[in-house]
Amino acid sequence: MPLDFVLLHYINVVNRDYIKDLSERAMKDIDEGNLDSAITKSTTILEETFCYAIEIKGEEPSDNGDIGKLYKQVKDLYSMHANKDMDKRVNKLLSGLENIVQSIAEMRNNGSDSHGLGSKRVNIADYHARLAVNSSTTMAEFILSVSQNSK
């Protein structure tokens, strides 16, 4: 079976509309005071986008749930590593993406509704939750663009 057929028929499409919808739902959660749910959605935005970018390359995601490992797989598949021949400002932006992934993963593990933490739960302000959602949305759109431009 040709890869295009498999992709078309078996992979749910992650596109800008999907990302926008999930982001809007996360912002609604913030407006309603459900900050931990918004953090979980910000992680989902990244995880879904990373998995989709990996799958359209015909690969299996390495470890669903660990967005750090998924992002590493995306970087490897799309050659998104810092490069001495690339503009240094672009390299700085690419290195900043690492921090976004790591920070959102940590917020999810310590400040969302995805795990029971009891008194160890980290409390965040609504503006921190907005930062997480907006950061994950921007990064997801970037990864989506990279994956679409490499077809």
Go through each PLM region and give its residues.
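Internal, Lys/Arg-enriched amphipathic helical interaction segments that engage polyanionic partners
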Residues: 1-32, 37
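Short, charged/polar, low-complexity loop and linker segments
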Residues: 20-28, 84-89, 117
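Short, hydrophobic, well-ordered secondary-structure elements
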Residues: 23-27, 34-55, 133-137, 141
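Secondary-structure edge/capping motif, primarily at the C-terminal ends of alpha-helices
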Residues: 26-33, 56, 115-119, 147
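Short, charged amphipathic alpha-helical segments flanked by flexible coils
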Residues: 58-97
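Charge-enriched, short contiguous segments at helix-coil
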Residues: 93-151
